[in-house]
Amino acid sequence: MIARSVRFECDSDEKITLLSAMSACVDLPDKDYEMIDLAGVWARERHVRRHKLDYGIQSIYSMRGCSSYQFNPFLALARENADEFQGQVYGFSLVYSGNFLAQTEVDNYDTARVLMGIHPNRFKWTLGKGESFQTPEMVMVYSEAGLNGMSQTFHKLYLSLIHI
């Protein structure tokens, strides 16, 4: 498990304005993955969508002001042969319930990149001297035990951190 976030600090006498604040950028050495995300509607939440990564940018996002059953701030990259109990899977979860962007990009060198954070549309944050802004954490997990292994890792992590 790896958790990433970014902290912006203003040490200038002049104010600075952030127009984008992504939490993490992760590069993978190849593009041989399928992207899995969870979309849905009322009474049909968390519909699993799975499709092969392709050149260019593929994204999921929400600008509703919160995460919801329509789009969840989560995506996974699974090898084509990965199933519920075997195969390599990377899982990415943004610990945030506001406007978000989660995207993958495949470049002309056949490498894949995952970018996740606060959606830049309608985002603007001004910092004065001595002020800071911390992005929400993006949590990344890896499993060689398929989608169930990834899910169990997330479950154990969040259950150990969240006490009801």
Predicted regions and their residues:
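Short, surface-exposed, low-complexity cationic segments
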Residues: 6, 141-154
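Short helix/loop capping segments that flank catalytic or ligand/cofactor-binding pockets
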Residues: 16-17, 102-103, 135-136, 143-144, ...
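Polysaccharide-binding surfaces and accessory modules of carbohydrate-active proteins
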Residues: 1-105, 121-123
